[in-house]
Regions:
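Short, acidic/polar
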Residues: 16-26, 154-159
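Cys-nucleophile CN-hydrolase/nitrilase-fold catalytic domain and related Cys-dependent amidase chemistry
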Residues: 14-15, 23-102, 109, 175-206
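Active-site catalytic loop in hydrolytic enzyme cores
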Residues: 88-196, 264, 268-270
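A conserved C-terminal secondary-structure "cap"
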Residues: 262-289
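Short beta-strand scaffold segments in enzyme catalytic cores
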Residues: 82-84, 96-99, 135, 233-235, ...
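CN hydrolase (nitrilase-like) catalytic-core segments centered on the catalytic cysteine
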Residues: 61-81, 143, 152-252
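Extreme N-terminal starter segment of soluble prokaryotic enzymes
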Residues: 1-4
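Short polar catalytic/cofactor-binding loops
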Residues: 7-12
Length: 289
């Protein structure tokens, strides 16, 4: 199965950014991709660099966004993984991945469970933690374990998705560096980000697709300069081997995912078989003290 990750920068406004994204979706579809993944919050800038109530306005188009991306998926006959700002009601918002099937129907959605609150990533101000659990989304091309960005640092999320039958793990993402970070620190952060996700592929015997954004986005509050989103979107197989990896520029990243490889890998590395589920109760504690 041919898959595509669309790694884009923000073009200063939603209209232009979406227009550029639509062009790439059409290109990817024409190139034979059956599954297309977009980055986290792909319609707008990464507004979570500061706490500003005016940014909640981005969520006002939630229902229209659903209809719009549904038509995009249908027009291009692709399974489309989007990342949208969900307005559930006034004062209650989610960072939500919505998956559309090839006929435009909503196959399912996932509300981001792990919400960061770090300098430049003030997501707790905007997003309520997800309440839909870790549920794979059934589509015409298989069961997709869709998670979002900060979720990628948690092996528990990947494991539960796998135990519930996910055939792919997918991470729409927005992550990058600050200018004050040293070259060595930037290298460490990027390598850690790639390593943790490849480890999810290995530990669970499933392919991983991680789609990040690129470009520099200023901090609108002026407290910090802004974030250089590092891109490096990638696709790896069930043994963590890289099938394709992007750099720091805009691109459409393609790979062919062989889902039969999951069975082959799990037969020689039966990690699920050897789990000692009778000994894991301490995982339900915040800390063992």
């Amino acid at each position: 199965m041919k898959v595509a990750l669309i790694q884009k920068k923000y073009y200063g406004n939603t209209k232009k950014t979406v227009k550029k994204t639509l062009i790439d979706i059409e290109i990817a579809s024409d190139s034979g991709a059956e599954l297309i993944v977009l980055q986290e919050l792909h319609q707008s800038e990464y507004f979570c660099q500061s706490e500003d109530v005016t940014f909640f306005a981005y969520a006002n188009s939630w229902e229209k966004d659903i209809l719009f991306w549904s038509e995009v998926a249908k027009k291009n006959s692709v399974v489309l993984v989007t990342s949208l700002f969900e307005k559930r009601t006034a004062g209650l918002y989610h960072n939500t991945a919505v998956v559309f099937d090839k006929d435009g129907t909503v196959a399912g959605k996932y509300r981001k469970m792990h919400i960061p609150d770090d300098p430049g990533f003030y997501e707790k101000f905007y997003f309520t933690p997800g309440d839909l659990g870790f549920e794979p989304i059934e589509t015409s091309i298989g069961k997709l374990g869709v998670l979002v960005c900060w979720d990628q640092w948690y092996p528990e999320a990947a494991r539960i998705m796998t135990l519930k039958g996910a055939e792919l793990l997918i991470y729409p993402t927005a992550i990058g560096w600050f200018d004050e970070d040293s070259k060595k620190e930037k290298k460490r952060q990027l390598e850690s980000w790639i390593t943790i996700q490849r480890s999810h592929a290995i530990a669970n015997g499933v392919p991983v697709l991680s789609c990040n954004r690129v470009g520099f986005e200023k901090d609108s509050s002026g407290v910090m300069d802004g974030i250089h989103f590092w891109g490096n979107s990638f696709i790896c197989d069930p043994q963590g081997s890289l099938l394709a990896q992007a750099g720091e520029e805009e691109t459409i990243l393609y790979a062919t995912v062989d889902r039969e490889r999951t069975k082959e890998v799990r037969d020689i590395w039966p990690f699920l078989r050897d789990r000692r589920i009778d000994t894991y109760k301490d995982l339900l504690k915040r800390y063992c003290d």
